Amino acid sequence: MQILHAGRYAYHPLCVAPSAVKSPISPFKPRALSGFAVRRTIAAYARCAALAQRAGYDGVEIMGSEGYLITEFTSARTNTRTDRWGGSFENRMRFPLEIVRRTREALGRDFLLTFPLSALDLIDGGLTGDE
């Protein structure tokens, strides 16, 4: 089962993202997630994966690519935060790493967990292979 959060690509007036940076494919400007909402979202990924495991799925893929919420956190272009979730590459990677850590805790070591991650996002000021 694949788990993803659309982030700023959500076509909804209440969409959220790491920062209030509008997507070129949606008419809605996202609301920046609060620190509490970031932690709640991490917990939601882990809970969703645990529910999939309980439902009998063989594995879970957490979508960390294609420009969705996780990629938005890793890219300096879409993550302009100044707290522990933004700024340096290490801080921007905290969100996906915490999702994987918490999800692995919830699933145990023997359940299949995959996580594709974009190394490039092909936008000016975004992810480059160098990071």
Residue ranges and their predicted role:
Residues Q2-E131:
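Flavin-dependent oxidoreductase catalytic cores
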